[in-house]
Amino acid sequence: MPQLNTAVWPTMITPMLLTLFLVTQLKMLNSNYHLPPSPKPMKMKNYNKPWEPKWTKIYSLHSLPPQS
């Protein structure tokens, strides 16, 4: 059985890995990456509060003297 000659393997594997690295880098350079989304300003909704028009006077406690 003949013996497998592995002396040339490093000279074939090294350029192959370098080529794969360069091709990957070029593909990544040409791809478009989207920016992270910016938050939209929220519009505050004004809800109808039924208690707002009712409380028009400020009542003081009966135990306290009247304040002016």
Swiss-Prot record:
User: Which GO terms fall under biological process for this protein?
Assistant: proton motive force-driven mitochondrial ATP synthesis
* Record membrane topology: Single-pass membrane protein
GO MF terms held by the record: proton-transporting ATP synthase activity, rotational mechanism
Q: Keywords assigned by UniProt?
A: Acetylation, ATP synthesis, CF(0), Hydrogen ion transport, Ion transport, Membrane, Mitochondrion, Transmembrane, Transmembrane helix, Transport
Q: Which family does it belong to?
A: Belongs to the ATPase protein 8 family.
The record's function comment reads: Mitochondrial membrane ATP synthase (F(1)F(0) ATP synthase or Complex V) produces ATP from ADP in the presence of a proton gradient across the membrane which is generated by electron transport complexes of the respiratory chain. F-type ATPases consist of two structural domains, F(1) - containing the extramembraneous catalytic core and F(0) - containing the membrane proton channel, linked together by a central stalk and a peripheral stalk. During catalysis, ATP synthesis in the catalytic domain of F(1) is coupled via a rotary mechanism of the central stalk subunits to proton translocation.
**Protein name per UniProt:** ATP synthase protein 8
Could you tell me the gene encoding this protein?
A: MT-ATP8
